[in-house]
């Protein structure tokens, strides 16, 4: 809630109007903003209306707005809904562009996994969206490297709960987020950001263990 107020205040900082003035965010859908406020006050999450196209558009709008205002928990919830209910070949290219634009690691991984396993179906089922995707050279290269290198076969299985530095590059997004959340670390960001964050934690923890052992030896 404070983050939303911060943006609202910053958007009016150059205005000389008094504190009772109304701030209009023309590019924010009123119903979507209501969903975000309801989540912040009550914890209620948006529900699907069983109209696939309408539901998809609504969920994407909520995700974009939640990301804009820093409502991370809602953003991650909606991201998981998009992966579970809307990730099909005909929507993969569009969702990949969305995920890349708004740093949605789980959605991005899911769309790239789908491409890796059903590349021709993804391309042929929606040529218009695939054409848009091809305009993003960096993302296209990333997708091809991902699909051709076998990187989509991430594993969450390690001998211990946290894994070692060497294990981390093989974790999928869900595994990374679970471990980060366990220690109250930030779970938002790209997969590379999550990996760096978890490696930093492991290194810091290893240093603490070494320090304790050194003191014992003395």
Identify the function of each model-found stretch.
Residues 1-88:
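Canonical BTB/POZ domain core
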Residues 11, 32-35, 114, 130, ...:
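A broad, structure-centric signal for solvent-exposed, well-ordered loop/edge residues
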Residues 154-217:
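Basic helix-extension-helix modules of the SAP/HeH family
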Residues 7-11, 39-43, 66-69, 81, ...:
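Generic recognition of well-structured, leucine-rich alpha-helical segments
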Residues 18-20, 28-31, 57, 69, ...:
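Eukaryote-biased feature marking scaffold/signaling PDZ-domain proteins and nuclear chromatin regulators
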Residues 30-34, 133-138, 191-192:
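Extracellular interaction modules
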